[in-house]
């Protein structure tokens, strides 16, 4: 976040633009914090991130991260607005894919799991990962 704030100080943008960009940076800053909480929860309960059920959501998060990295570069270098809007649409498509994936995971979980503790822990992780997916699409939690 510091790099973006420094760049803002060197760039001519209106105070409104500067405030929006700083809000955007703070919004993005929370994503790694959310991911850290997921990792902590998984470690606390001895859950393996390599489980195939978690990988579906993790793959979506990685795709979103790559898109967001490109979008931030577009903002910094004031590049093609059309490409930026295309990336926003792709983020929203990934968010919808995340919603669909969550529904599939929950359906499978409730159909297959007989262990209540495992069911609750996995559901909790699914929900936390879904919040990360939503965050990239700029959905408030």
Predicted regions: what they are:
Residues 1-141:
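Cytosolic, long alpha-helical scaffolding segments
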């Amino acid at each position: 976040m510091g790099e973006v704030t420094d760049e803002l100080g060197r760039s001519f943008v209106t105070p409104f633009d500067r405030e929006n960009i700083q809000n955007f940076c703070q919004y993005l800053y929370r994503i790694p914090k959310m991911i850290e909480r997921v990792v902590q929860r998984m470690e606390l309960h001895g859950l393996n991130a390599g489980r195939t059920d978690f990988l579906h959501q993790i793959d979506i998060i990685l795709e979103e991260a790559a898109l967001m990295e490109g979008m931030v570069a577009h903002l910094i270098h004031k590049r093609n607005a059309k490409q930026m809007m295309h990336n926003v649409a792709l983020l929203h498509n990934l968010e919808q894919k995340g919603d669909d994936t969550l529904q599939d995971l929950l359906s499978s979980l409730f159909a297959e799991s007989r262990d209540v503790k495992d069911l609750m822990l996995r559901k909790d992780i699914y929900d936390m990962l879904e919040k990360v997916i939503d965050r990239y699409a700029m959905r408030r939690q």
